[in-house]
Amino acid sequence: MKIVFMGTPDFAAEHLRKLVEKKYNVVGVFSQPDKPKGRGKKLIPTPVKQVAREYGIPVFQPKSVNKGEGFEALKELKPDIIITVAYGKLLKQQVFELPPLGCYNVHASLLPKYRGAAPIQRALENGEKETGITIFKIDEGMDSGPIALQERIEISSDDNFGTLKKKLCNLGKKLLIEFLKKISAGEIKLTPQDHSQATYAPKITKEDTILIEFDNGERVFNKIRAYDPEPGVTTRLGELRVKLFGAGICDNCCVDAEPGQIISISKDSMVVACKKGAVKISKIQFPGKKVITVWQAKSGRLIEEGIKLGG
């Protein structure tokens, strides 16, 4: 079975590595074009490209795989199946109908919920108690094709974007190998999605990561953990913009302060008042500096009880 793999970030790269480790015949890899990063604007290869190079797999980075040279390169590979994981572009009919076994995507949500680019962050931000991995057959819609396999996992109160992404990546790799075994044996049965239950997970914008109001402790907790450890939620501290990490639920906090006011600072965390309830925060990042604990920030006289965040 000749596999063409399409993906771009580290989440996808881990799936590609698993395929190679399990001795699957990956005949080609498609990834988004390299992007300039850092002060020197040096072109950095995508994580998927790095893994493909490591194993000597041909890599293609066309502006579009749906037409022109990109599509011609794909046709020449004569894949039996295409697997996509966070590739970053919608595929047209001529692409997903090319391989005899079809074109399948590994998606980090329980479809039809959270179709789109940022399912992990949006699930956390909305306070979901569970999520999962769905492998589905690609059609002309966005994450709307029939489901081949799906498995759910619990979202714990300790999870943030980093920990949940790792859990889902491990589940995705396991499910992908299971899927390939089943499709090779002709054992895959497709189940149409219930489109009436669809929700969406749009791409993250800068505005999404800004925290203005400390209105509800649970909402603030979910927002901070949805973008922890990257890119971090930004809020105001006087004239500065700081990033907050390590949020926790403050169940038994006695709150009698203005929203955004720091009530207390301990070695573990600081408690910040909200209109409803409060939130614990353990780490903070000042502009141009490394992430430090709130206790280090207090010891360095960067924060103190009584000052306000937000606005």
UniProtKB/Swiss-Prot annotation:
<dbReference type="GO" id="GO:0004479">
    <property type="term" value="F:methionyl-tRNA formyltransferase activity"/>
</dbReference>
<dbReference type="InterPro" id="IPR005794">
    <property type="entry name" value="Fmt"/>
</dbReference>
<keyword id="KW-0648">Protein biosynthesis</keyword>
<dbReference type="InterPro" id="IPR002376">
    <property type="entry name" value="Formyl_transf_N"/>
</dbReference>
<dbReference type="InterPro" id="IPR036477">
    <property type="entry name" value="Formyl_transf_N_sf"/>
</dbReference>
<dbReference type="InterPro" id="IPR044135">
    <property type="entry name" value="Met-tRNA-FMT_C"/>
</dbReference>
<dbReference type="Pfam" id="PF02911">
    <property type="entry name" value="Formyl_trans_C"/>
</dbReference>
<dbReference type="InterPro" id="IPR041711">
    <property type="entry name" value="Met-tRNA-FMT_N"/>
</dbReference>
<dbReference type="InterPro" id="IPR011034">
    <property type="entry name" value="Formyl_transferase-like_C_sf"/>
</dbReference>
<comment type="function">
    <text>Attaches a formyl group to the free amino group of methionyl-tRNA(fMet). The formyl group appears to play a dual role in the initiator identity of N-formylmethionyl-tRNA by promoting its recognition by IF2 and preventing the misappropriation of this tRNA by the elongation apparatus.</text>
</comment>
<feature type="binding site">
    <location>
        <begin position="109"/>
        <end position="112"/>
    </location>
    <ligand>
        <name>(6S)-5,6,7,8-tetrahydrofolate</name>
    </ligand>
</feature>
<keyword id="KW-0808">Transferase</keyword>
<protein>
    <recommendedName>
        <fullName>Methionyl-tRNA formyltransferase</fullName>
        <ecNumber>2.1.2.9</ecNumber>
    </recommendedName>
</protein>
<dbReference type="InterPro" id="IPR005793">
    <property type="entry name" value="Formyl_trans_C"/>
</dbReference>
<comment type="similarity">
    <text>Belongs to the Fmt family.</text>
</comment>
<dbReference type="GO" id="GO:0005829">
    <property type="term" value="C:cytosol"/>
</dbReference>
<dbReference type="Pfam" id="PF00551">
    <property type="entry name" value="Formyl_trans_N"/>
</dbReference>
